């Protein structure tokens, strides 16, 4: 018996929708990263993008446990001396709902061309509506 290796043109991708209302950020992010990578499939191959498309709705209603809403910090830098900016999870959810989830998932995926292709299959929406009903996504419960 030979070892199976998936080919990029033979991969079939499903569409899934996740309702993130009152779900914990890290638990949703780890499941999304797992499925974007394709590790839930028997034909998973590390060097081929075998993952599915994931739609996350109600990302503005994600929560974190403990005091992380005020204590968890996100940093960015302008590139200039002294140009570091920080924001908390709570403020980021107010200004850009869903960005915290995108950053969490992106950190869990491989770095490089394969990881960049995987993150493009993630669609995050702050509200309950999404424009992907034509793909007939299946509900995924976490």
UniProtKB/Swiss-Prot annotation:
> Which Gene Ontology cellular-component terms appear in the entry?
cytosolic large ribosomal subunit
Query: What is this protein's function per UniProt?
Result: This protein is one of the early assembly proteins of the 50S ribosomal subunit, although it is not seen to bind rRNA by itself. It is important during the early stages of 50S assembly.
How would you summarize the oligomeric state and partners of this protein? Part of the 50S ribosomal subunit.
Q: What is the protein name for this chain?
A: Large ribosomal subunit protein uL13
Keywords carried by this UniProt record: Ribonucleoprotein, Ribosomal protein
Q: Which Gene3D superfamilies match?
A: Ribosomal protein L13 (3.90.1180.10)
From the UniProt record, give one GO term of the biological process aspect: translation
CDD domains reported for this sequence:
Ribosomal_L13
Q: Give the protein family.
A: Belongs to the universal ribosomal protein uL13 family.
Q: Which domain of life is it from?
A: Bacteria
Query: Mind telling me which InterPro entries this protein's record contains?
Result: Ribosomal_uL13, Ribosomal_uL13_bac-type, Ribosomal_uL13_sf
């Amino acid at each position: 018996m030979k070892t199976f290796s998936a080919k990029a043109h033979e991969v079939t991708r499903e569409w899934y929708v996740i309702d993130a209302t009152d779900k914990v950020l890290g638990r949703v992010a780890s499941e999304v990263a797992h499925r974007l990578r394709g590790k839930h499939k028997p034909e998973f191959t590390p060097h081929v993008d075998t993952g599915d498309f994931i739609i996350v709705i109600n990302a503005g209603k994600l929560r974190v446990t403990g005091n992380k809403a005020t204590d968890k910090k996100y940093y960015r830098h302008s590139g200039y001396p002294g140009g570091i900016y920080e924001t908390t999870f709570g403020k980021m959810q107010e200004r850009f709902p869903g960005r915290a989830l995108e950053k969490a998932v992106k950190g869990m995926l491989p770095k490089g061309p394969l990881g960049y292709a995987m993150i493009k299959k993630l669609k995050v929406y702050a509200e309950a509506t999404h424009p992907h009903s034509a793909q007939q996504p299946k509900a995924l419960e976490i």
